[in-house]
């Protein structure tokens, strides 16, 4: 099911497309009407998913119907404490809008509800939705997922992913940029990032051409805005009811940064600067001439006058990129009753990632201030990291705390994530401690946590017990330190997940 959006004229973020007709969810006639008319009611056994809407895992259709034992559960208000969301597997939706493992996903959602999880995070990939040709969007698989989450009683956070996933076509989790974008990059390689050695990085389009019509007459910012606008129009019945938050991708891994080595490197400032495509170099030359700075081809001395100028320009370019996307997203989702999220990297080589941090300068403060200006929530990963487990010259735990302090200083709502999905008891406790570190320093705290991510191992008995206990502890952390008893739900969920662990693949 492909949806062609109305045409747009101009770059202005205030120009909104006409409302897309209601046909995007015509495939789900019962859902299309129930989203608007839904009222919490007494639970009863109801068959709500027919084989037409949710065929079995084999994809053969058949006549089998899936019944939720208690019918559509009422969506409760925000739980006390810190809400926990769970990010779905990367390959949940495949090419052509195919939802994989539907039957297992239904059982998984039931288990999450029983454990007290608030909702799920759904990554919506640009390369899948607008993959075939520009301006043609296929949301079918994601519509199914959101509908399933609604009927299971889960809320949804949508992550609009404008970046590449995986290392290449041989990677089982490989999702490239849209094919038509890759064709344009093949014609003009400078659309992609490049370091001083000419090595290209195709994770994300170079921000040097943000406002240039390099994508078949549209600029990258226009393409991102059109995608967000079509998402809003397609999912309007769910926004503010089921979909409560939208994270907007701003760079590699969805984070507002340049491509950069991860924290696996020994030093914080290593990594090559990603500014050697012709568009970035043209901007650098123009800024240098305007500032009266003598150009230097090799930025070897970052402490010198040119080095300081270069780092300010490099970080300002990143901030301007974030500003453009924030402006578009705020305009598009202004009346949608969802909060918008931006993500930063906390476990990267700071200077090459675009975070100009020194002993007297905090590179995260300008970003947090920008997010606060637009009412965005700030997302940061690595909440489970303990320095005792790290052998590096710079504290990785300190990275995360630096981001949290910036959010606290700017009074920005916070969303935490783990970077390693295999968490032990100490790691879960560190997540709680890190969450409290932010929470205790904010006058009107707003915090939630995304567990990254759902997998077969998550539902193994010992891991599931550990996870459900973590969710319970997170629910107990609030201003009044309420002590809530979720024991019954947790015990029920243990037995209901053994089959999921076996079926997941």
Kindly give the residue locations of the regions a language model identified:
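N-terminal chloroplast transit peptides
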Residues: 1-53
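Short, acidic/polar
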Residues: 94-113, 356-367, 396-400, 434
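Polysaccharide-binding and catalytic clefts of secreted carbohydrate-active enzymes
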Residues: 182-369, 376
């Amino acid at each position: 099911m492909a949806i062609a959006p109305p045409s747009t004229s101009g770059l202005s973020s205030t120009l909104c497309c006409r409302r897309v007709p209601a046909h995007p969810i015509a495939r789900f006639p019962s859902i299309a009407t129930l989203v608007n008319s839904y009222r919490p009611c007494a639970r009863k056994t109801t068959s709500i998913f027919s084989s037409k809407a949710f065929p079995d895992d084999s994809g053969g259709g058949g006549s089998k119907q899936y019944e939720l034992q208690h019918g559509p559960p009422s969506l409760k208000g925000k739980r006390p404490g810190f809400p926990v969301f769970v990010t779905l597997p990367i390959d949940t939706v495949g090419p052509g809008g195919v939802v994989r493992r539907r039957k297992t996903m239904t059982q998984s959602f039931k288990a999450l509800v029983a454990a007290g999880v608030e909702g799920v995070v759904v990554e919506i990939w640009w390369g899948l939705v607008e993959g075939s040709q520009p301006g043609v969007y296929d949301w079918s698989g994601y519509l199914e997922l959101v509908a399933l989450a609604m009927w299971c009683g889960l809320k949804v956070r949508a992550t609009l992913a404008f970046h590449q996933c995986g290392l290449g076509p041989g990677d089982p989790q490989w999702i490239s940029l849209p094919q038509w974008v890759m064709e344009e990059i093949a014609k003009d390689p400078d659309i992609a990032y490049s370091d001083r050695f000419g090595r290209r990085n195709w994770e994300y389009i170079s921000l040097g051409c943000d406002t240039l019509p390099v994508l078949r007459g549209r600029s990258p910012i226009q393409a991102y805005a059109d995608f967000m606008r079509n998402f809003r129009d397609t999912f309007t019945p769910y926004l503010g009811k089921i979909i409560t938050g939208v994270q907007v991708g701003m760079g590699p891994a969805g984070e507002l940064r340049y491509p950069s080595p991860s924290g696996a490197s020994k030093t914080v400032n290593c990594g090559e600067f990603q500014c050697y495509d012709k568009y970035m170099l043209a901007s650098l030359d123009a800024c240098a001439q305007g500032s009266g700075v003598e150009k230097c081809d090799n930025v070897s001395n970052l402490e010198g006058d040119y080095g300081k100028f270069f780092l300010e320009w490099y970080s300002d370019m990143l901030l301007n990129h974030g500003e453009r996307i924030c402006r578009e997203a705020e305009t598009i989702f202004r009346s949608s009753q969802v909060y918008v999220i931006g993500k930063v990297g906390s476990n990267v080589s700071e200077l090459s990632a675009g975070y100009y941090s020194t002993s007297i300068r905090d590179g995260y403060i300008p970003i947090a201030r920008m997010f606060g200006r637009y009412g965005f929530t700030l997302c940061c990963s690595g909440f489970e990291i303990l320095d005792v487990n790290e052998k590096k010259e710079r504290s990785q735990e300190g990275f995360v705390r630096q981001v949290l302090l910036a959010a606290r200083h700017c009074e920005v709502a916070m969303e935490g994530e783990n970077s390693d999905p295999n968490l032990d008891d100490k790691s879960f406790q560190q997540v709680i401690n890190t969450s409290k570190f932010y929470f205790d320093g904010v006058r009107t705290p707003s915090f939630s946590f995304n567990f990254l991510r759902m997998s077969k191992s998550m539902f193994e008995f010992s891991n599931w017990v550990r996870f459900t206990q973590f969710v319970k502890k997170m629910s107990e952390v609030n201003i009044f330190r309420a002590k809530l008893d979720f024991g019954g739900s947790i015990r029920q969920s243990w037995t209901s997940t053994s089959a999921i662990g076996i079926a997941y693949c």
